[in-house]
Amino acid sequence: MHVSKRWLAGLALGVFSLSAQADITVHDIEGRDVTLEKPAEHIVLAEGRQLIALSLLDTNPAHWLLGWGSDMKRSPELYDIYHKRAPELDDLPIVGDGPGPGSISVERIISMNPDAVVLSRSQIPVSQGQELMHQLDAAGIPVVFIDFATDPLDDTVPSLRALGTLLGREDQAERYIRFYEQKRQAVLDRVGQISKADRPTVMIEAHAGMGECCNSPGQGSFDYFAKRLNVDNIGADVLKGKSGRIDPEYVLTRDPEVYIATGGGYLRQVNGLVLGPDVSESEARQSLKHILERPLIGHLSAVENGRVHGLYHHLINTPLNILVLEQMAKWSYPDRFKDIDAQRTLEEINEHYISDPFMGSLWVDLKK
């Protein structure tokens, strides 16, 4: 049988084409294109909290992990959600314990030989992670950046899309993305119809009850929600960084129309605002009332008018941050967003999208 050189060349080209088609390219949150021969099967999460994002892509998110950051274990109310299904998380190796590249054990990651490492931009910016990335690249380990903390409303979709591509779970990622974008746009379209004269002043007290009043978001993070909602976050007017302390006299002078406190289970020991998946509504409301007993806060018009609210702090840096947008919209413009129901949105997420439901009190209102 005679086999022509042209036929062999065509066969080789076809095999090469199939091989090339098997490659995947992940476009990450930093605009980097990261190429892998095939979807990752085992990864390392430098920030353990990103397990929540994984749980929107797979019913058993823990099975993807070879190692993770310790932050999830420092949030027991979040850790317990996933530990119930995956007790093996107790033994999952820790690769880092905080922000900055110096907190990451490159040697431990390399010894695990993961298919990829997922870094959070808010934890390790590219500008600070060059040496870390160089070492991992030298070991043949791709690095993908995602983020849900710095600019949540803009970064959630591309971060989920990158994670979906990385793991070969594009369909699951796009399913939640469609839901997220529809909910987000429903709020933002209505905000666009609100005049500047109706723009309320809002005070956001972060980690309410931890130390003296008042810790506030400055630029970024919560303030991005405020800006997209066309509300005036009084902290952003005086704080140039991401967060800081605002002067009590300044707070009294501005006398915000709406007061939003953030907190979590980590504030129980200091009698701060307690919210989260493991918190009852009665405990959440009682803790909100307690922080209002402080002399400064108790004199605000927002308190006198009953426009006082509490929000679980850790919601903002997860793909569930759509709940933050809906709640802040309703609190800021109660007459215009009467039909917005974040509780119903949470129920939809729990029923149709996330592997392990989020229950408990994720927000609370002061009922007079």
Where are these regions (language model features)?
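Structured C-terminal subdomain patch of bacterial secreted/periplasmic proteins
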Residues: G96-D97, D151-T165, R268-K368
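Alpha-helical, coiled-coil/dimerization segments enriched in small aliphatic residues
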Residues: C214-G241
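Bacterial N-terminal signal peptides
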Residues: A9-S17
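Pocket-lining segment of extracytoplasmic ligand-binding domains
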Residues: I234-Y250, D255-V279
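Short helix-initiation/N-cap motifs at beta->coil->alpha
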Residues: I29-G31, L92-S105, L239-D247
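A short, structured surface patch at a secondary-structure boundary
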Residues: L51-S111, A116, S120-P125
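Bacterial Sec-exported substrate-binding components of ABC uptake systems
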Residues: A20-S55, D171-E205, F337-K368
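Extracytoplasmic ligand-binding site segments that recognize negatively charged/polar headgroups
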Residues: M72-E77, R121-E131, I146-S159, S195-Y224
